[in-house]
Structure formats: C-alpha cells, structure tokens
C-alpha cells in the first residue's frame, strides 16, 4: 500500500476521514448506540474522538482530498485510478483482501486514497516543471552516468556474499555464470542495463555501479529491503559503459526526468505545493479542535518567506557594503 500513498505519508487513510465526514453529514442528535437509560449520539461520538491524533490526521486527509479533487480532479481520470488499483491488487495477489483489512481499508476507501495520492502527485509534478532551470539540468548532469551494461547477483546474507565476492574476483572467474548460480533473486536475472537515474535496482547498487570502470567488480553492497526489513547483499560488475558526452543538452530529456523525480519526492517541496493549494482554497477551520491540522503547511510558507527575507537581507547587506566601499574610495580620492 505504501507505493501508492507515499505523497500522503503524513496523512492517515481515508477510512477514518469518511467516519468524520459521516458524523458531520448526520444530525448531531442521531443515536449511534442505545442502551437502557442512555444513548450515544453522533455529537457525543464526535466530541469524544475529535481531539485524538487519528481524528486530527483524518480531518487533514479529508481536507487535502477535497481541495485537490476540486482543483485537479479533471487532470486525473477515473480510469487511471482504476488501473493503479488493479495493479496494486495484482501485486498482492490472493493476500490483497487481507492487506486491505490489515490497513483498515475497504475497496472504496483504498481507491479514494490512491486517487488523492495521484492528484497530489500531478500537482507536485506540474509545479516542479515550472521551476526547472538550466542550473538544475547542469547540476543533474554533474552526477549523471549514462547507460551501463552490468551483471548483478543478489544474496541473502553477508557471509555468503563475501564468499561469492571472493569467487567472482578470482583470476579467470566467469562472473556471469557464478552470479547466475548463486543469486537468490526470484527471477534469477543477472543482466541489467541502466543509467545513474534508474530505479530498477536499489539506489546504492546503481551508485556503486556508477563509480566503477568498465570491467570492474564492486564490493558487497548491503541494502535494506523495505518490503521485508531484511538486508540483501549485491555484487555488481560493469561490462560496458557508455562514454559521457561533454554537452549536458544531449541528455536533456533524461535529465529532466531525473530532476522532476527528485523534486516530486522532496517532502518540503510537496508540502509547499499542498500549502499553495490550501491557500487557494481559502480553507477556514471552524472547530478549534482542528485549529492546528494545517500547521505543517503554514510553517512551509513561513520557511519560504524567511528564506526570501534572508536572501533579501543578504542582498541589501551586500549592496550597502558596496555603497560604503564606493563612498570611502571617493573620499580618499
């Protein structure tokens, strides 16, 4: 479930948000529970739960969901939402229903969650495009490594990985054959092509390959598997490496993809985009119990304002210094 909702990492699932929404759309005096001598109304339940952390986050989630649906709903088709949902269901297979239940989700609430994430993702990506500069391209180019042809073996424990490393580094060793035999990868795949901005392998593995020369073999690269929370160990050999062109513009399209990916994954940038959307929607908190749910986005605005003020102060200070030096020079003359 994490893949589809990473842009909303600080917000809980829509399941709780729907509960709050139901409370708000039902008469406050409607009885939820009846018993001898007493009843529990919607109002009782709302007042009892609204100050809890889960309700605070649920309300935030509901606000963000509504705002982005209003501002960007036409940009993401329902078909795309369904496709993303079906893809997730396929990945989980027979355990999908259990995974939903464990996350406190239903089919409908999970689809809403996916859609909210996709709407935020769209907005963040569009905002990132508007901020692209030649400086961004040049910075990305500096650390960019063009396509590499590699052979990679994956091991489940460090001791075995070190033993395999000794084998593949032995004189005359056939790396590909050993890698194929020893790898614990489910598909037994060892041949890969990627550049430094690719994501088909863990970032640390790609980084290790990027630093190798053609024909070189890496040391053992340890990577924490986010799915199992267990370390996996990789050894990579670069068999072919494209020569890097001196003009960054040759890779402009690819560099754009890399820069946009970095920006859209940046939490501060995401928060800035969400803050702007909330400001445009003129969100007003009527119940003081929820007064602080947008604080993280208000802080984003303050940070940006503070940064701009700092830059302005630095410029003013620099200009004042120049004026002072100029006046001193004229006085000396």
UniProtKB/Swiss-Prot annotation:
S-diacylglycerol cysteine lipid modification positions: 23
A Pfam family matched in the record: Rotamase_2
Membrane-related topology note: Lipid-anchor
Positions of region (Disordered): 301-333
Main location: membrane
Lipidation (N-palmitoyl cysteine): 23
Gene Ontology CC annotations of this record: plasma membrane
PANTHER family in the cross-refs: FOLDASE PROTEIN PRSA, PEPTIDYLPROLYL ISOMERASE
Protein name: Foldase protein PrsA
Organism field: Streptococcus equi subsp. equi (strain 4047)
């Amino acid at each position: 479930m994490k893949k589809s909702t990473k842009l909303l990492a600080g917000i809980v699932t829509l399941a709780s948000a729907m509960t709050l929404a139901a409370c708000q759309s039902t008469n406050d005096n409607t009885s939820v529970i009846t018993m001898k001598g007493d009843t529990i109304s919607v109002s009782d339940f709302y007042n009892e739960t609204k100050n809890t952390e889960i309700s605070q986050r649920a309300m935030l989630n509901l606000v963000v969901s509504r705002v982005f649906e209003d501002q960007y709903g036409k940009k993401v088709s329902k078909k795309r939402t369904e496709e993303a949902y079906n893809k997730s269901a396929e990945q989980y297979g027979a355990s999908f229903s259990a995974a939903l239940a464990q996350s406190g989700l239903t089919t409908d609430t999970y689809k809403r969650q996916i859609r909210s994430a996709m709407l935020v993702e769209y907005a963040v990506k569009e905002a990132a495009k508007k901020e692209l500069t030649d400086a961004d391209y040049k910075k990305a180019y500096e650390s960019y490594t063009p396509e590499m042809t590699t052979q990679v073996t994956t091991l489940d424990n460090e001791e075995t990985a070190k033993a395999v490393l000794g084998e593949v580094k032995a004189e005359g060793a056939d790396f590909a054959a050993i890698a194929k035999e020893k790898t614990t990868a489910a598909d037994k795949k060892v041949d890969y092509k990627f550049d430094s901005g690719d994501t088909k392998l863990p970032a640390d593995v790609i980084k290790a390959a990027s630093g190798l020369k053609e024909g070189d073999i890496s040391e053992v690269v340890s990577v924490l598997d986010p799915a199992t929370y267990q370390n996996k160990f990789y050894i990579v050999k670069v068999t072919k490496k494209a020569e890097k062109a001196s003009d960054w513009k040759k890779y402009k399209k690819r560099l754009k993809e890399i820069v946009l990916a970095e920006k859209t994954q940046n939490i501060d940038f995401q928060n800035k985009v969400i803050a702007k959307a909330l400001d445009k929607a003129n969100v007003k908190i009527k119940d003081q119990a929820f007064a602080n749910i947008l604080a993280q986005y208000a802080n984003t605005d303050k940070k940006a304002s503070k940064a701009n003020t700092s830059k302005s102060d630095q410029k003013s200070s620099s200009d004042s210094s120049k004026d002072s030096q100029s006046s001193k020079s004229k006085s000396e003359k």
